[in-house]
């Protein structure tokens, strides 16, 4: 029997690894939700309703975490006792810092020129970069290189932020 304190992976009876069968996750989530959905406990007592609500909330949180590769990696690292240190560890490889500066300049230049096509191209580049880095992150996590994986997570978080900024610029220019 799974308890509320077990890992997200245990809740869905999945291996605690980065590579994840999304169809198996979806099926496991639906199975758990079928068992604990509050509607099934409409006629139950308050205590049972409260427990069902806790389980449903727990299942939703676990599903959202495991469904998102970056959240899944962060969670997996936390299970291994590794804090990614996103708030206080901003040290990154010099090459990545240079890439950050280039992306920022591209955003500024394209926004100043009101060039939506350039922003679209940058967004595509960021998506490709994210995809490649997620593959590398999976390799790092599966090989137990947790500190390198933590840095990769921080880099991916930055890439997501930049992509969000690009999206906001595109939206601003198109309105």
UniProtKB/Swiss-Prot annotation:
InterPro entries: DnaJ_domain, HscB, HscB_C_sf, HscB_oligo_C, J_dom_sf. Disulfide bonds: none annotated. Keywords: Chaperone. GO terms for molecular function: ATPase activator activity; protein-folding chaperone binding. The keyword Chaperone applies. GO terms for biological process: [2Fe-2S] cluster assembly; protein complex oligomerization; protein folding. SMART domains: DnaJ. Gene3D superfamilies: DnaJ domain (1.10.287.110), HscB, C-terminal domain (1.20.1280.20). One of its GO terms (cellular component) is iron-sulfur cluster transfer complex. Transmembrane segments: none annotated. Belongs to the HscB family. Co-chaperone involved in the maturation of iron-sulfur cluster-containing proteins. Seems to help targeting proteins to be folded toward HscA. This is Co-chaperone protein HscB homolog. The gene is hscB.
